[in-house]
Amino acid sequence: MPVVFREGGYRFHFFSNEGDPREPVHIHVTKDGIDAKLWLHPEVTFAYNRGFDARTQRWIVSMVEARRAEIEDVWNGFFA
């Protein structure tokens, strides 16, 4: 499970087996047993959210938007 970055106790990562055919670029976020998955395109949106409150969801979206290029670089490098 490649970890792209950690911030404030949150782990931003993806899985090495992302389906066949592979799903589009996305990121998983976990903390304290709570998790979410976000699509990066066409805009950053939740695929699912399993427990993060609205304020935390807004923060997660802002983090992913700010680091979208980094996430894509790591994803593309891993799956190249």
Over which residues does each language-model region extend?
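Negatively charged, low-complexity tracts enriched in Asp/Glu with abundant Ser/Thr
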Residues: 1-12
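A broad, low-specificity signal for short, low-complexity segments enriched in glycine/proline
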Residues: 1-2, 24, 33, 75-76
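Generic preference for hydrophobic/aromatic residues in regular secondary structure cores
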Residues: 4, 44-48, 67
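A short, structured beta-strand/loop element
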Residues: 15-54
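C-terminal structural segments of small proteins and small subunits
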Residues: 51-80
